[in-house]
Structure formats: C-alpha cells, structure tokens
Amino acid sequence: MKGDLLKGSRCVVTGASIGKAIAEAFAKCGADVLITYVSNKAKADETVAEMEKYGVNAYSFRCDAGDEEDTKRLADYIKEVFGSIDVLVNNAGAIGEEAPITQITSDEWDRIMRVDVKGVFLATKYLIPLFDKERTGKIINISSELSVKGRANYTHYTAAKGAVNAMTRSLALELAPHILVNTVAPGPIETDMILQDMSSEWVEKEKNIPLGRLGSVTDISAVTVLLASKYGEFYCGQFISPNGGAVFI
C-alpha cells in the first residue's frame, strides 16, 4: 500500500500494536498521521520516524484512552497541528486477564470497560467537532471477532467489544452522511503483544482456523486504508472482520 490514496488526509490513530501498522499504512498512502500512546514514548517516536520517511507530517501524543482530561488535551493538540481531521481510528484497547466470570474482579472489569468502551466514547465525543466540514469524515472502530463469536474466560473483553459494535451502529445512524462510522473486527492476528504475552501452545491453537495461520497486521491495515479512502464512501455502520474463517469455528 503506497502512493497517494490518502494524500491530503489528516488521520488520528489511538493506541499501538495494530494501531502502529494502521498508522504506517496511512503514511505510506500519503496521509498526515497523529498517533497516541500511554507509556512507551520511545516506541511512539520510532513510529513517527518511520512515518516521516514517506514525506508526511507525523506526530505522537500521550493520551490515556479512558481519561477525559487527557482526551481534551489530545483534541487541543490535534487542533493545533492539523486544524481539522478526516479520519479517526479508535484502536486503543486492552484484552484483560484470562479468568472465569467468578474470578474477574470488579476492578479488572472496570479497567477493560474504561479503556475499550469509554476510550471510544471520549475520543469520538471530543474529536467529532474537529472533522473537516467540507469532506466526508471516517471513524473506524477496532473491535474483535470474539465480540460475535465469544470466548470462555474473556467475558469482560467480549462484552466491551460488543459494546463497541453497538456504538458503531448507533453512531453510523447519528453521524451520516457527514461522517461514516464502521467497525473492523480482527480475528487471530500475529502481533508483538500476542507473541510476547501468550504461550506457544496458545498461538498454535489460534491457528486452528480454515486458513491455518494467524493473520498479519497488514491484513487489518489494508481494510482500514480502504475505509479511510475515497473507495470507502459507501460503507456505513458495517462490521468487517478479517478473521481467516475463525467465526465458523
């Protein structure tokens, strides 16, 4: 994905991991991009440097996705560097600890809801006023195929992502035709977080899908580029899930 497909677009991508791949794909296609991070400034700076290699303007900003004051400061900074925006990718999220429902603490439940649900709410609430009134805006919410498939011992995570899906549908009705809102729901994707945090046995089990492999971050970034581009202007309220057939298992 290179060229000028997104030339002139100003995009905001929250969170890292898949968000890094999305941000770099946007930059390759000519977009100016701002990314957010919580703690790893060095990694964010590396991503900015990678994006700048494509001759675009790139920025990073520290923002805790579930913190309202942080999000207000993010909006102020975006207004300062971009003026207005065209694309928001709500990617920041947390998976949570694997545990049966009887062992999920209230604090852990609240933590996941704060990041995965409230984070989408806050970014959308405070960044909507920044969308360019003369262009069709795009909001892309990153969910998970587990939001429809379910997963034992991850009720907090699947519930949070199910809420994101519902928010997408309501926002699509509320904001169209000026801003188009869609969900991208990845299946099992090979990310640094997965490879570092999960056992090799878990990773191998995740490959037990019709395509027989984990997806790549490129499989996800390609869809987000489509939705962010001029070719995504008849998508509204959609649930798009690159998952290698995982939903059938």
Describe the residue ranges of each PLM region:
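Substrate-binding pocket helix/loop in short-chain dehydrogenase/reductase
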Residues: A99-I101, T105-D110, I139, I194, ...
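A glycine/serine/threonine-rich, flexible loop-to-helix segment
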Residues: H156, P186-I209, D219
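Alpha-helical segment proximal to the catalytic Tyr-Lys
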Residues: P129, A172-P177, E233
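Active-site helix of classical SDR
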Residues: T124, A160, T168
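Canonical Rossmann dinucleotide-binding motif of NAD(H)/NADP(H)-dependent dehydrogenases/reductases
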Residues: G3-L34
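Short C-terminal tail/terminal secondary-structure segment
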Residues: I95-E98, K149, K207, V225, ...
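Residue(s) in the substrate-gating loop at a strand-loop-helix junction
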Residues: S144
